[in-house]
Amino acid sequence: MDFDYSPKTKDLQDRLQAFMEEHIYPAEGAYHAEIAANTAAGKRWTPLQTIENLKPKAQAAGLWNLFLPVDSAAASGYDGAGLTNQEYAPLAEIMGRVMWSSEVFNCSAPDTGNMETIARYGSESNKARWLKPLLEGKIRSAFAMTEPEVASSDATNIQTRIERQGDDYVINGRKWWTSGAGDPRCAVFITMGKTNPDAPRHSQQSMIIVPAGTAGLTVVRALNVMGYDDAPHGHMEVLFANVRVPAGNILLGEGRGFEIAQGRLGPGRIHHCMRLIGLAERALELMCKRASLRVAFGKPIAAQTVTQERIAEARCKIDMARLLTLKAAWMMDIGGNKFAKNEIAMIKVVAPSMACQVIDWAMQAHGGGGMCDDFPLAYSYVNARTLRFADGPDEVHRNSIAKAELGKYMVKAKPA
């Protein structure tokens, strides 16, 4: 078994790490200062020039749209990096060290998932209208799936209606946690809803493209995540009231929503988990540096046995999560979503919980400082904790893993 990265991946890792050192880490202070200045000026939901100024540099460095896998690149007609999931995974980890950096490389959610969805399932006209400007970074997008009135962890509960009327579809419903909808550059929503309530359970839902600004589409409010609003990106509550779009905006056809979701969410979960591993790596680095410098009870905090135990445990947890995630990425490359289903569920359980624990230990080592925004740890923890819900809660993935495991033995069971 070869655990080494390909020469192509190593080259991109080196170039990406160099870009982070030269441009991203030095810009962290400017990023937060710009948000503070925009907030004071009443312009909190304004695109950040700190990020916009770095995008041309990322493009010039050949570090643009790295997420787009081989099959989606071919479908989109985009001649980019064309990486496999396994090749992209370590790059996502590097970007994850600074939570906003993936946007610099046009590799941030939900745009990545939306671009892959349109590339794979959209018509040629939809690709021309939406995919091209998304790949160029000229517009942003949102993904509307979760609903406030039902337990959306069971996606068959989704109640938003998408009804055919002549040459159009009319959409009615309410969504929340619609990430990306707060950005004024958000030009398009991919929305999941019910087209046929009488169809079999997993054939009732469809996905459809909804241009922002369509009559009846209203962004109701921004939702805070443990006090953070993630402006200017945002997680919004959105109302669809008799929103009418052309029938050609349906993706893949009626009743194919779950099929699309599986194709979309698998790579997205790998991206999220690898970014979390990068976030946890940075938290461990900060923990080690802080513990080595601070003295309590006559010796460095790093000399305390409890601190050493946590550092060792953090290293073990991070490396285990990374290996499992890379395995899931490799399995997806060779066999697709269904082949990697169990491993993807496992990483979605393991990586967020690991990151929460490692970041929590790092916060503890920072004392009171770990709880404030003088350090990135509190915000990092919120991000990691959110991903125990986003793209499916822990409980759903644990149930899936357990069913697969029990299935190995149920066929052999005999009545007593």
Residue ranges and their predicted role:
Residues 137-146:
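A short, Trp-centered hydrophobic/proline-enriched beta-strand micro-motif
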Residues 152, 219, 249-254:
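Cytochrome P450 core scaffold surrounding the K-helix E-X-X-R motif
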Residues 167-168, 172-220:
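A short core secondary-structure module
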Residues 105-125, 154:
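N-terminal glycine-rich flavin-associated loop
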Residues 149-153, 180-184, 197-199, 226-234:
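Short Gly/Pro-enriched turn/cap motifs at secondary-structure boundaries
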Residues 159-161:
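Short, surface-exposed charged micro-motifs
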Residues 157, 215-244:
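Flexible, small-/acidic-enriched active-site or ligand-binding loops
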Residues 1-99, 108, 121-126, 133-138, ...:
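Alpha-helical interface subdomain recognition
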